[in-house]
Amino acid sequence: MKGKIVAIIGPVVDVSFMDELPNINDALEVRLSETETRTLEVASHLGNHMVRTISLEATDGLARGMEVIGTLSPIKVPVGKKVLGRMLNVLGKPMDGLDEVDTKRYMPIHKLPPDFHDLGGETEILETGIKVIDLIAPYIKGGKIGLFGGAGVGKTVLIQEMIHNVAKNHGGISVFTGVGERVREGHELYHEMKDSGVLDKTALVFGQMNEPPGARLRVALTGLTLAEYFRDGEKQNVLLFIDNIYRYIQAGSEISALLGRMPSAVGYQPTLATEMGKLQERITSTRYGSITSIQAVYVPADDYTDPAPATVFSHLDATTALSRKLTEDGIYPAIDPLGSTSRALTPSVVGQEHYDTAREVQRMLQRYHELLDIIAILGMDELSDDDKLVVHRARRIQNFLSQNMHVAERFTGQTGSFVPIRETIRGFKEILQGKHDDLPEEAFLLVGTIDDAIAKAKKL
């Protein structure tokens, strides 16, 4: 199947075919030289034997009249164990300066979600080692988790910490998909993983900020295809990290405008919910294995009612909200214990003791926030003895929700900590019972277990 380029407008390329037309989402190739090709993806049929395509690479070097070859299938990317430890682009080509991935297995990036009868149903908790997450908004194996936050509140650091903890403590395979984020962060992540020894359990796929919108839109599907093969072909439990899902929506919005579709609310594409559904419905557990996905969600201007974060919300099992106020107070990870939620925080899943401890922590923090206005106007002395005790313990709880990160060791000089869930529950239970009312507040800041806080208090 051969055609000719008839128009190029930025990343949009119109191609005419003399006989049959390629299918929607099929890949087309343009040869620039013996070694160089450009890949296009069919977006719509225009009539008169013409198709409109989106280029997945820069359109430099393309010209009208060039020959286009139909591949008769969607983009296919390499899958399997050979992609572990590698850094790939949207087309599955290496970005790490090494040779092509040596595998015979290739899979198309466009496919249907698993059949209903193939889905897995049991609910099991994924231990992250991060106290505030494990206590307040526990993650489900095979669930979808959103990290919500504005610019610079620590979404990427939290994702890197999660990759580190899962690789070190669960031995699982991770697929990291960088969608429209900074090239520098991808470079740092690659070298950090190499240094910490978790790279050989991870596949990295990047379509960064400098790439055309076609690459940024499709790179999430490339990462997902790699994860699906590990789940179904290798029968593994996989972690899929997407940083940032908002950039996926943003790329879809750019392409929608380039294709001349009428925008909907706030300039987003009219197909926003459909595009998100196609991606999210493929991220699930089957009877063969599970994909647990952790997605960073940039919230434009910290506005949670924006259509992009609002659309993502409807697909999630747990939400981890990052708070700018907590970063200003020096509490890291800056996760808001009152704004974060999880479907798993029920007695039937986590057990009665865990549930009661988490709810009591939230109740005390909620009361503390209500009292802050009174304290600001009248001072601590005007509070009742009960309320003074709430403030006293809530401050210790708020500090104890922080901890040092392994991936931030070289910045902070402090050793990172992985805290098992049972230790997390014990620590918060003891604070709630008043066993550590005599320790100073600072002793609870950026420590791991309650024993670390007691040891720190002795040094103060």
Curated annotation (Swiss-Prot):
Its main location: membrane. It catalyses: ATP + H2O + 4 H(+)(in) = ADP + phosphate + 5 H(+)(out). The keyword Membrane applies. One of its GO terms (cellular component) is plasma membrane. The keyword DNA repair does not apply. Belongs to the ATPase alpha/beta chains family. Keywords: ATP synthesis, ATP-binding, Cell membrane, CF(1), Hydrogen ion transport, Ion transport, Membrane, Nucleotide-binding, Translocase, Transport. It is a peripheral membrane protein. The lineage of its organism: Bacteria, Bacillati, Mycoplasmatota, Mollicutes, Acholeplasmatales. Its EC number is 7.1.2.2. F-type ATPases have 2 components, CF(1) - the catalytic core - and CF(0) - the membrane proton channel. CF(1) has five subunits: alpha(3), beta(3), gamma(1), delta(1), epsilon(1). CF(0) has three main subunits: a(1), b(2) and c(9-12). The alpha and beta chains form an alternating ring which encloses part of the gamma chain. CF(1) is attached to CF(0) by a central stalk formed by the gamma and epsilon chains, while a peripheral stalk is formed by the delta and b chains. ATP binds at residues 149-156. It is an enzyme of class 7 (translocase). It comes from the Bacteria. Pfam families: ATP-synt_ab, ATP-synt_ab_N, ATP-synt_VA_C. InterPro entries: AAA+_ATPase, ATP-synt_VA_C, ATP_synth_F1_bsu, ATPase_a/bsu_AS, ATPase_alpha/beta_chains, ATPase_F1/V1/A1_a/bsu_N, ATPase_F1/V1/A1_a/bsu_N_sf, ATPase_F1/V1/A1_a/bsu_nucl-bd. It is found in: Cell membrane. GO terms for molecular function: ATP binding; ATP hydrolysis activity; proton-transporting ATP synthase activity, rotational mechanism. Produces ATP from ADP in the presence of a proton gradient across the membrane. The catalytic sites are hosted primarily by the beta subunits. This is ATP synthase subunit beta. NCBIfam families: atpD.
